[in-house]
């Protein structure tokens, strides 16, 4: 998490230490150094955040050299490293995306203002020769602007779609209980798992659960 730890809030957790607190004098960043900064979730996911909540540690400039060193170390210890970046339209800030293997724009296809913001972001990425994947969130079947229309306007392809279910997701966020755990059979959870499997290079169709028969 390169911002203020929103990803931790989604799982009702807080960080004791943040990556921004690594002393500047430290030149060699390895996994052993980073382990104390991890917040371990019961799902097995490890969270690292660059800053605390705003009242404790306001976000500042992220040194790309330090970020690259951190990512290099994390790649050595984890099969997948997912980086959540703050929303920004400043082209210089987008340079950090050049450090990523893949980039995903999460867009909400609701109105023309959202389309304008997404287009500006995609254009900014193109300055750094970054071609993002387009993931649509909170998609409504009866929306005026379809994901296909927006993708066409952006010159990108629809990578995946997550349906709109405000009640389920808002409750999940407020409780800090991930929807894929609390409501695994919901359409939102299924879509999130599908996107995760696609990102991991796995078949998007989930393996069928084995049925066990008991005879008494």
Predicted regions mapped to residue ranges:
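A structural preference for long, well-packed, hydrophobic secondary-structure segments
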Residues: 41, 49-57, 64
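C-terminal boundary of histidine-terminating zinc-finger modules
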Residues: 19, 172-192
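Active-site/binding-pocket entry motifs
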Residues: 44, 53-54, 167-168
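Flexible beta-alpha connector loops of hexameric P-loop NTPases
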Residues: 20-27, 54-61, 110-112
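Phosphate-binding loop that captures ATP/GTP phosphates
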Residues: 1-47
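Acidic-aromatic/histidine active-site loop/patch
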Residues: 27, 123-127, 131-132, 136, ...
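Short, hinge-like loop/turn segments at secondary-structure boundaries
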Residues: 12-17, 123-125, 150-153, 176-180
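Conserved catalytic-core segment of NTP-binding enzymes
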Residues: 66-69, 73-76, 80-160, 164, ...
């Amino acid at each position: 998490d390169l911002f203020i730890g929103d990803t931790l809030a989604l799982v009702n957790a807080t960080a004791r230490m943040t990556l921004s607190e690594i002393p500047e004098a430290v030149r060699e960043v390895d996994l052993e150094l980073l382990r104390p900064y991890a917040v371990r979730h019961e799902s097995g996911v490890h969270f690292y955040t660059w800053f605390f909540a705003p009242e404790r540690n306001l976000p500042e400039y992220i040194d790309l050299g330090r970020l690259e060193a951190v990512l290099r170390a994390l790649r050595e210890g984890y099969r997948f490293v997912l980086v959540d970046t703050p929303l920004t339209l400043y082209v210089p800030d987008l340079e950090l995306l050049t450090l990523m293997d893949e980039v995903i724009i999460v867009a909400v296809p609701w109105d023309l203002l959202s389309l304008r913001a997404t287009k500006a972001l995609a254009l900014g990425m193109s300055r750094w020769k970054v071609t993002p994947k387009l993931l649509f969130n909170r998609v409504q079947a009866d929306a005026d602007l379809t994901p296909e229309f927006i993708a066409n306007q952006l010159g990108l392809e629809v990578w995946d779609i997550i349906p709109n279910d405000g009640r389920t997701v808002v409750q999940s966020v407020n409780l800090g209980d991930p929807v894929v755990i609390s409501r695994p059979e919901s359409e939102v959870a299924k879509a999130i798992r599908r996107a995760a499997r696609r990102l991991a290079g796995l078949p998007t169709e989930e393996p069928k659960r084995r049925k066990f028969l008991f005879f008494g």
